[in-house]
Design a protein with these regions (language model features):
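Cell-wall polysaccharide-cleaving catalytic domain and substrate-binding groove, primarily
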Residues: 3-128, 133-219
Length: 219
């Protein structure tokens, strides 16, 4: 929350030394207020910056980037197209397949969010995830998807810090919730597998995320 409050006071546009993912050749195109928010995300989510990626989870457990006994896919994210990302993130791709891909880039965009962002921005499926495109997707997250956060950054009348942080926590797992909240999740058994009803649909239950916890339950 202190980091988000710093955004409200308009941090200078100078990027701090040693920020994960920074290189002399690749710098953010974001305006200072948005860039300040992005710093919080990069530190918690994407140490490789624009080139970062993960393979998702299996039964709620994050998958390793390295796959035992198999060659890891060449994940040059800034050269990856939107359609390639979607093709490599379909549920039918097994956890031990090195081609499997989930969240990508500086802002750890997941496939569902990427689809919405590309539609909002008018990009084609052939568009690559260049740094500028990733920055524009982040702008979509703030301006189109998480408006309470954007309103708080702009100091709009009626904006609320707690709501802003909660929106941030909903989008990025590394950000803790600002207060205790109830969320609806898939119920899991003792082996951490999703419990399903007679029709095969996941059984839902409400759980409480304590202040500072991830909205999505990761430690």
């Amino acid at each position: 929350r202190a980091q988000l409050e710093a955004v409200r006071t308009r941090l200078p546009p100078i990027r701090p030394e040693g920020l994960p993912g920074d290189t002399p050749e690749v710098k953010s195109t974001l305006a200072p207020p948005m860039e300040a928010v992005s710093r919080v995300i990069v530190k918690g989510e994407s140490p490789l910056g624009y080139g970062d990626w993960n393979r998702g989870t299996s039964n709620g457990i994050p998958l390793n980037k390295a796959v035992d006994g198999k060659t890891v896919a060449d994940n040059n994210i800034v050269e990856l197209t939107h359609e390639e990302h979607l093709a490599r993130s379909v549920p039918s791709i097994k956890a031990d397949d090195p081609q499997k891909l989930f969240a990508i880039g500086r802002y750890q965009i997941i496939p569902e969010t990427a689809i919405d962002a590309f539609k909002f921005l008018g990009y084609s499926k052939k568009q690559k995830y260049t740094p500028e495109v990733q920055d524009n997707m982040f702008k979509y997250l703030l301006m189109g998807k998480r408006k309470p956060l954007y309103d708080y950054i702009k100091d709009e009348k009626g904006s609320d810090k707690g709501k802003a942080v909660l929106e941030m926590a909903k989008e990025f797992a590394s950000i803790g919730v600002p207060y205790d909240v109830q969320v609806t999740v898939n119920k899991r058994d003792a082996n951490n597998k999703i419990v399903r009803d007679a029709n095969g649909k996941p059984v839902k239950e409400k759980v409480t995320r304590k202040k500072g916890d991830s909205y999505y339950g990761q430690p």
